[in-house]
């Protein structure tokens, strides 16, 4: 079958021919319809320091997808041939304390699809049936293919009660923009998103944020004054991993503010911990999605009217995958969809 693989320990992704995966007793075989390119896939393409330490070569990559069930392991219940599914990209162990306690998103032995085991940039994917999620009929293939990153956004945004709150989102990548849209949809008062990429800030405006702020040109305190905010942000969603953005968030949070961090900062990021202590801030780390509460909320948010379609900016056939990666690497895109049909 055709598959996009990290074939060599250098920059790039290659179209390869690999054997079709075998279906285990508890697995589903999924025929891939559409996939989306994640920032993680760009890291793997660029072969940065993280990728060199993490990715075995060769490896079929990718973890954002929608497809159709075409094979079912003999122990699997609850699925049938023809079901349209996406799936949780974190394969969990099932036997650690968190897994056994129902907190599977906190599994200490997580294996990543397209990172530690073969991924979805292929004609077929095998995953445990436990990880599959049936897509409702009224949700399109395009939207279903981005459920994985949308789940990051939902998990982060819904970490705290947002009704009536003023929310700061730092980082206008696709996940940050979707988190801002979720915050607005569920009843936040002001949702302010910051970045230095004007293309992506304009995408955020299309998604309905209160203010999209280019912090290289505007002062966040001036924006707060313009919005009539006198006490700071109630909730911060840190999606950038950029130390200056996080420090600015700490500066502008209200006392007792709550911060959810999805962005991965450099390991040596320094902050003024006095601001955390004396403001009484609460900081929560976010990894992946809650299994599977986040997935049900994702479907419900879309079914209740949340419009994510502006975040999908590019479509390519799989033979034009290089154009898709070029678009993602340029920073002048939202989500990029690759079609396998």
Curated annotation (Swiss-Prot):
Q: Which domain of life is it from?
A: Bacteria
Show the GO MF annotations: L-threonine 3-dehydrogenase activity; zinc ion binding
List ligand-binding residues for Zn(2+) 1.
Answer: 38, 63-64
A GO CC term attached to the entry: cytoplasm
Q: Name one Pfam family in it.
A: ADH_N
**Residues reported in the UniProt entry to bind NAD(+):** 175, 195, 200, 262-264, 286-287
Catalysed conversion reaction: L-threonine + NAD(+) = (2S)-2-amino-3-oxobutanoate + NADH + H(+)
Requisite cofactors: Zn(2+)
Coiled-coil boundaries? none
> Keywords, A to Z?
Cytoplasm, Metal-binding, NAD, Oxidoreductase, Zinc
Active-site positions, per UniProt? 40, 43
Q: Which InterPro entries match?
A: ADH-like_C, ADH-like_N, ADH_Zn_CS, GroES-like_sf, L-Threonine_3-DHase, NAD(P)-bd_dom_sf, PKS_ER, Zn_alcohol_dh
User: What does the record's cofactor remark say about binding?
Assistant: Binds 2 Zn(2+) ions per subunit.
Q: In which pathway does it act?
A: Amino-acid degradation; L-threonine degradation via oxydo-reductase pathway; glycine from L-threonine: step 1/2
Site (Important for catalytic activity for the proton relay mechanism but does not participate directly in the coordination of zinc atom): residue numbering on this chain:
148
Q: Main location per UniProt?
A: cytoplasm
Where in or outside the cell?
Cytoplasm
**Role according to the record:** Catalyzes the NAD(+)-dependent oxidation of L-threonine to 2-amino-3-ketobutyrate.
NCBIfam families noted in UniProt? PRK05396.1, tdh
- Which PANTHER family does the annotation name? L-THREONINE 3-DEHYDROGENASE
HAMAP family reported for this sequence: Thr_dehydrog (MF_00627)
Quaternary state and partners of this protein? Answer: Homotetramer.
Q: Which family does it belong to?
A: Belongs to the zinc-containing alcohol dehydrogenase family.
Its protein name is L-threonine 3-dehydrogenase
Q: What is the lineage of its organism?
A: Bacteria, Pseudomonadati, Pseudomonadota, Gammaproteobacteria, Enterobacterales
User: Gene behind this chain?
Assistant: tdh
């Amino acid at each position: 079958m055709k598959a996009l693989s990290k074939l060599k320990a250098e920059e790039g992704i290659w179209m390869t021919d690999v054997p079709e995966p075998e279906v285990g007793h508890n697995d589903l075989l999924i025929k891939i319809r559409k996939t989306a390119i994640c920032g993680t896939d760009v890291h793997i393409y660029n072969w940065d320091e993280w990728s060199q330490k993490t990715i075995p070569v060769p490896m079929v990559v990718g973890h954002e997808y929608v497809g159709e069930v075409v094979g079912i392991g003999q122990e699997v219940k609850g699925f049938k041939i023809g079901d349209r599914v996406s799936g949780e990209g974190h394969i969990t162990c099932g036997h650690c304390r968190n897994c056994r306690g129902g907190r599977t998103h906190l599994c200490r032995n997580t294996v990543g699809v397209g990172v530690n085991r073969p991924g979805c940039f292929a004609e077929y994917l095998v995953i445990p049936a436990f990880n599959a999620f049936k897509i409702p009929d009224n949700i399109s293939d395009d939207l279903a293919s981005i459920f994985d990153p949308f789940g990051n956004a939902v998990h982060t945004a819904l970490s705290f009660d947002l009704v009536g709150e003023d929310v700061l989102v730092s980082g206008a990548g696709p996940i940050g923009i979707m988190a801002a849209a979720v915050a607005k949809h569920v009843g936040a008062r002001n949702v302010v998103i910051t970045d230095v990429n004007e293309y992506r800030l304009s995408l955020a405006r299309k998604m309905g944020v209160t203010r999209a702020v280019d912090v290289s040109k505007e002062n966040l305190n001036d924006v707060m004054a313009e919005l009539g905010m006198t006490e700071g942000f109630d909730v911060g969603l840190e999606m950038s991993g950029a130390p200056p953005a996080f420090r600015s968030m700490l500066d502008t949070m209200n006392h007792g503010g709550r911060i959810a961090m999805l962005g991965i900062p450099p390991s040596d990021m320094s902050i003024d911990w006095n601001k955390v202590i004396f403001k009484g801030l609460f900081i929560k780390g976010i990894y992946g999605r809650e299994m599977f509460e986040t997935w049900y909320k994702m479907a419900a948010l879309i079914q209740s009217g949340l419009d994510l379609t502006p975040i999908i900016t590019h479509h390519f056939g799989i033979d034009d995958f290089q154009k898709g990666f070029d678009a993602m690497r340029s920073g002048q895109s939202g989500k990029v969809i690759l079609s396998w049909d």
